[in-house]
Amino acid sequence: MEYAFASTRLKLRSASLPLNRLRALSESATASEIMDVLHRFGLKDTSSSLQDADMVLRGAFKREAEGVLRMVKTSKFLALFLRKFEILEISDFLTNFNESKLAVKVMRTSELLSLEHSADLKSIIAQINRRFGFNLNQNMAIGEIEDQILSQYLLKLSLISPTSIKPIIEKERKLIALPHSTDFEHFLGEHKGSWFYKVLNVDKNLIDLKMAVYLQHISKIYAVRDPIGPGAIVSYMYYLDLNYKFMKSLYFSVKTRIRLNLRAIWEI
């Protein structure tokens, strides 16, 4: 099935979470804010005016575009993973784009990796297994493959311990929130004083354990120190390729309440 997907739109979608946060804070972003966001994410301004840039930004949040974002979230994560390790070029996901109409046609999830110009799904899985020593089943659904890649990759990086934090990734990809459990309290106690501990303690019911582990990972890699604000949290997350689901869990699942809490933390 032919589908359209533009490089620029891919970048806009990658940036859509912080853009969404910006729009939540201000329903009518100024032209300068729009240009700043476009340049911040490395988007070359191909338009001739700020008005055109405004149209590009706002077009990314049309109802139909948001529907497309939900449809492609599975391929988005897998595409980032494959690109990161040069298993599959991201360009294989991009074809025939009609910018004026925001024409984006997306295959059903089961067909997302049936690419015309690349290896088939079984070949891709075989490459991943050889490269990382994984044991991915070629007959699994794409969503299951995605979960297995993420959980096995995190375990390889020693980011999670299945004996002390249970379980980070569920098969159905449900959020894990353990506000009253021994494991969760122990986890908080081990990391008291860190900036993500402050995030968790604002409202523990709003944050899942995956997010805590991910924040811990970022703080280690970039030696992040207190205080740090929501803008910086977003920026650091976007330097990591394997970020899509974690960002989704933070900025979509808990939405406005957590954004406001993050803003309050910035002022601590």
Q: Where are the regions that the model predicts?
A:
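N-terminal domain-start signal
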Residues: 1-268
